[in-house]
């Protein structure tokens, strides 16, 4: 074996270097500026430590802070390790478990000592101070490879039972990498890491909160303390992020949902939503809007059972792939005379549906279908249940019971591209009605999947070609292909909405599926008189009503457009002499189809204005003695200064226009 290897750089130039040379040494040979700026290396596209020796011919790219995505991933990973070291320094006996980088920071899960108990938010400044001390010490971050059994013994000796358990599940004889911070602290980690803690900016991170978590996300396991932080490359990025967090807090749908009396959640129905009258108005408006859209697009609405036999889920493939996220119950009447229900060993099992697709196939299979019957578009506002971990639940954004605007299009091979293109046009119109821009992504085959490579090639090409024909595969629409992100049965197109403060939310999807029709034996009679499998297009636009409403609340800061607002107008009196006129005005507004309430309380008008503004009522119609005599109203519109005086009839006409859903307006 030669002592020299060939290293090819991004510009195409190549260098012969000694085997064992590090990327850091190559950076230094190129120039002192690059040596200082280089943070890590990409070896044949894979992110690696800059101090890790090169052992074979390779393509090398040096990562600097200009490569922001890679640099942020490295920095956040390192902040997580520095956090763990700081906690163990300050609180001896605390066990470390797991701590990854996240989309805007990092977290680490700890098992505190029984004497200390769970960590508290007020301890975060102390931990931050210790983290800055570790960063200032510029401790080298050194990779070391251990034998699995030796590492398990080391973790047990150090009292790190969680790490020992994790290591014990790795294959016997496997070498495991650990990273040392200096010579006095280590963690088990695949890496990569920066060369030293001093590469981090001590003013570019902040610990944000503490929460509970469970070992491996399972509530049956030990409860842990999770410390969250946000980490960036410099203090300017951190400051900008904190401003975004402050703005996001103002828009938090959980707080606004309470203030506007839209919904609530409670432990007795963990992960399920109690919709209040105001919130359910929003729900019903969205439901009516979507029904009009799908009716016009040629869909037929159906309703399917909540509970189905486990054998159906086994046949569809969901039981093997999705069982741990399903709510399962025995198909047997419990023996109520005993202390608790008894389930026999041979009991049959039922499951609450986590998705609607198998049931729609069963509808398709009822009665013989001809090629002339296709495409058949079945739509359902389908209520589903998924057993999400407690720690993953988040307001309306992540729930256990949710309703999808779900549809499945059964079509022939020659109809796929047109159906996908039509769906793209439908989704575009709907998202624009709500004021959203979006990016569209193609999620490609995952490592674990059903079906042949040829089938996946065909399905991916069909989705790709439909987007190209629709003119959406462009930079304007954020077109991107995402390897490994598809469902286990099909590739999918994803719609990522951008809200008022620049955050993105993945909502709509369409998937081209040849697996499920085959597994559930769906067929139609072709023009040739033979049986053929339909292709099944799974699609949704809102995703789920719960999550979409949460997104709308935050996007509009609770200030829904008039057509969606639970209460569209309030008629408020200045003096009691105007009470009768206010009642009559309210009645006329209600008769015109405007959701209106009257406020006749003996309160100052400024108090009423403030209260209804906080409730996000879009229009306040103020009436006093003069308005009653002249048949006028003084209209105040939420978010605008001043007021307009106009005849009541004119005000009703204006509000009727604003209360008209966008799809019912002349386009």
Curated annotation (Swiss-Prot):
Q: Name one GO molecular function term.
A: ATP binding
Per the record, the GO terms for biological process are:
threonyl-tRNA aminoacylation
The UniProt record lists the EC number as 6.1.1.3
Q: Which GO terms describe its cellular component?
A: cytosol
SMART domains given in the database record = tRNA_SAD (SM00863)
Q: What gene name is listed for this protein?
A: thrS
Q: Which domain of life is it from?
A: Bacteria
Cofactor(s) demanded: Zn(2+)
Q: What biological function has been recorded for the protein in this entry?
A: Catalyzes the attachment of threonine to tRNA(Thr) in a two-step reaction: L-threonine is first activated by ATP to form Thr-AMP and then transferred to the acceptor end of tRNA(Thr). Also edits incorrectly charged L-seryl-tRNA(Thr).
Annotated ranges, domain TGS: 3-64
Q: What is this protein called?
A: Threonine--tRNA ligase
Record-linked InterPro entries: aa-tRNA-synt_IIb (IPR002314), aa-tRNA-synth_II (IPR006195), aa-tRNA-synth_II/BPL/LPL (IPR045864), Anticodon-bd (IPR004154), Anticodon-bd_dom_sf (IPR036621), Beta-grasp_dom_sf (IPR012675), TGS (IPR004095), TGS-like (IPR012676)
Q: What class of enzyme is it?
A: ligase
Cofactor: binding comment: Binds 1 zinc ion per subunit.
Q: Where is this region: Catalytic?
A: 252-561
Similarity field: Belongs to the class-II aminoacyl-tRNA synthetase family.
User: Which keywords fit this entry according to its UniProt record?
Assistant: Aminoacyl-tRNA synthetase, ATP-binding, Cytoplasm, Ligase, Metal-binding, Nucleotide-binding, Protein biosynthesis, RNA-binding, tRNA-binding, Zinc
Q: Which Gene3D superfamilies match?
A: 3.10.20.30, 3.30.54.20, Anticodon-binding domain, Bira Bifunctional Protein, Domain 2, Threonyl-trna Synthetase, Chain A, domain 2
The annotated subunit structure for this chain is: Homodimer.
Which amino acid positions bind Zn(2+), per UniProt?
A: 357, 408, 538
What's its catalytic activity? tRNA(Thr) + L-threonine + ATP = L-threonyl-tRNA(Thr) + AMP + diphosphate + H(+)
